[in-house]
Amino acid sequence: MASQGTKRSYEQMETGGERQNATEIRASVGRMVGGIGRFYIQMCTELKLSDYEGRLIQNSITIERMVLSAFDERRNKYLEEHPSAGKDPKKTGGPIYRRRDGKWMRELILYDKEEIRRIWRQANNGEDATAGLTHLMIWHSNLNDATYQRTRALVRTGMDPRMCSLMQGSTLPRRSGAAGAAVKGVGTMVMELIRMIKRGINDRNFWRGENGRRTRIAYERMCNILKGKFQTAAQRAMMDQVRESRNPGNAEIEDLIFLARSALILRGSVAHKSCLPACVYGLAVASGYDFEREGYSLVGIDPFRLLQNSQVFSLIRPKENPAHKSQLVWMACHSAAFEDLRVSSFIRGTRVVPRGQLSTRGFQIASNENMEAMDSSTLELRSRYWAIRTRSGGNTNQQRASAGQISVQPTFSVQRNLPFERATIMAAFTGNTEGRTSDMRTEIIRMMESARPEDVSFQGRGVFELSDEKATNPIVPSFDMSNEGSYFFGDNAEEYDN
């Protein structure tokens, strides 16, 4: 990718910063997570949570959601203009769980959004600290990616459930900025664009007038974000076609679906970063760790280190398996929902199983669930090794855009070969190469056909011992190739419902 020089690193996107050197980036990312930690500690004080209750991931999620809701300007404005029954637009809240006489109790709390904003700003040196808010959104998005399936949403937009490995970040709110755009998968961007085009088909005023002009700008910006994720000239040229279309319609939807399919072999570059629950940063700050002084990176050893010595708990339903619950959070913390299970298992040091074999449901507990039978257990979030997070699709060499890894979107920059059955994927490309994008389609199909399963991605990259913080001795794992590496195999997870 020749354009590397013009790109800001994730950390710069994440902190809204201009060009900075590595030390400055580490410091500003440190300032960001330190602010989240200070905010969390303050909220625990406000709510009088015990140490144990403050380490409960459900409480962390409620507190994170409250601050995100307090800063959601668009929704706040909407709520004030459309007062709905029983919703106070100025308040936010959620369930907080407390330990009383050996049992867990649910308490619904309500806070002024203004008060939450004040506490957040106070924890962030008086600033709005949007970067920290985005960071929390990405953690929630990673948790959703690991917990829920999006088959319904895929089918609704005319895509194929087999494209689920392209759906990273599909539940991120639109306001998540550049850092959010970086972690969205190709399928997520395609889906957002298709929804937009469909609205334009059904509502003739969608692209017209002053509003329509703004819509058009948003459409072109989304096209450019998606174009930037593709690594081959033909895919990018096709995106130019979609972007420049006078009035986008079914032809563009066809092109986008074709591109999404092609991304199963010619993978897009999607960023991965380890975003941890607020309570983890809170614990570290409370123990006297100075993130800004020490510096922090979302794509290196730091999150692994932090998780090695953080004790976090989760409420657990009677029939759930605590080890499976831990796996979900571990995957979410490292943004590894779409990673090859062989790679994840090696790094984690315990077997990571496909979602179809997990006996656990989501983390949020519905208000009608019985608390009597609720227990809590420690989440096992430690790892055996650490590895650098990648921002590429795992293509072996950029010159001839070879195959990225199929049915997964690599998270860790670790050498692996590609377990894929090309015939299965090529079957999705029956015929249709006519129309104005025919030459590009032909070229893309040709590249896909020449992709070889025996290719190796991330050549020579390995994992590192946790004592090797400078990443000096890569250990290149060898994998059993007979195993299918996809997490979504035999999927039976719940659908994500907003």
From Swiss-Prot:
Keyword Transferase: no
Domain of life: Viruses
Regions that span the bilayer: none
Main location: virion
Molecular function in Gene Ontology: RNA binding; structural molecule activity
Post-translational modification comment from the UniProt entry: Late in virus-infected cells, may be cleaved from a 56-kDa protein to a 53-kDa protein by a cellular caspase. This cleavage might be a marker for the onset of apoptosis in infected cells or have a specific function in virus host interaction.
Family under the similarity heading: Belongs to the influenza viruses nucleoprotein family.
Record function comment: Encapsidates the negative strand viral RNA, protecting it from nucleases. The encapsidated genomic RNA is termed the ribonucleoprotein (RNP) and serves as template for transcription and replication. The RNP needs to be localized in the host nucleus to start an infectious cycle, but is too large to diffuse through the nuclear pore complex. NP comprises at least 2 nuclear localization signals that are responsible for the active RNP import into the nucleus through cellular importin alpha/beta pathway.
Name by which UniProt lists this protein: Nucleoprotein
Organism of this sequence: Influenza A virus (strain A/Tern/South Africa/1961 H5N3)
